[in-house]
Amino acid sequence: IKGHCVHKGVLKEPILNESRRGKSDSNAPTALLVLDLDDYKPEVRLPASGITSAHLTATVEAIRAELPEPLRSASCIANASSSTGMKADGVIGLHLFFLLEHSVPVSQLTHWLTGLNFCVEGFQSQLKLNRSGMSVKWVCDPVVARNSQLIYISAPEMVGVTDPFVTPADRWALVQGATPTCNLLPTLVNLVPATVQQVAERTLSELRKSLGLKTLKPSYRRMDIDGEKVQVLTNPDQLQMTLIRTTDKYAYWNINGGDSNAYYNPVGNPEIIFNFKGEAPFEMKRANEDVYNWYCEQYKTQI
């Protein structure tokens, strides 16, 4: 159904034609584990056309075999993203939903998902920089651990192109395992977040160095934004910023030639650029002063 998505966490109260901001308990333990694999080239490729649920199952079974226990033995539900089958070189996007035997803290789950990018060979070998150059583009996105996260599951509307899947239902598969749930608690007990963070920072430095960029030494200031404490990056790289569109509330940007439309600011306040990628928000003026000045002039009646 058009527009359908999964809200990762339980809502505090019903939502009706309003923002979901602040409506979920960000610290509530979760029993839903989602692996969001983005721009991933699997070992077992999907066919270029005529993709069925059986094809999807075979691909996911091969991916699951690379995962650590207890995921390797657990059943999961697979959902192919809207771009799957449309990109070159067999690159796909997948959501894998696992049910946990016991609820776990979101913060621990976030670190563990980040660590999967280093301990799964197929993930680690495909890591690269985000377009901003200031963060790693994870194969397995840790942002989906958040209780407030939306996970888009609707089949795409195909206009002028042929759907590579036989039917919308073929974008889904129940991939049976030895157990219906998985118990992450023993694994999370031994998790050291500082170790994961160090590996993440080293990976970022190595990827930046490979592109001739210096090591990023981030500087932050803590700001109160809409009642929330936010760490804002005050020394971003110089960025190419392209305004894509504006709505009544927000302006959306692409960075360094990207096409995700994942960066945004309130129309009337261009000071801080936020994003949907899990990167730290940054000061627009520091990233591109010319664009900042242009925006302030262009939208001065709304600022």
Q: Which residues does each predicted region cover?
A:
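Signature for HUH/AEP ssDNA processing cores
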Residues: 1-94, 98-116, 206-218
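Generic recognition of flexible, low-complexity loop/linker segments
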Residues: 20-23, 83-85, 139-141, 259-264
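Flexible, charged surface loops at secondary-structure boundaries
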Residues: 26-29, 145, 267
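Structured loops at beta-to-helix junctions and adjacent beta-edge loops in soluble globular domains
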Residues: 36-38, 81, 99, 153-158, ...
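Short conserved micro-motifs at the rims of enzyme active sites and ligand-binding pockets
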Residues: 45-47, 162-168, 286-287
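Long, charged low-complexity interaction segments
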Residues: 89, 97-99, 185-273, 278-281
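Catalytic "initiation/cleavage/transfer" segments centered on a nucleophilic residue
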Residues: 116-217
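Short, small/acidic-rich helices and loops at N termini and domain boundaries
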Residues: 267-303
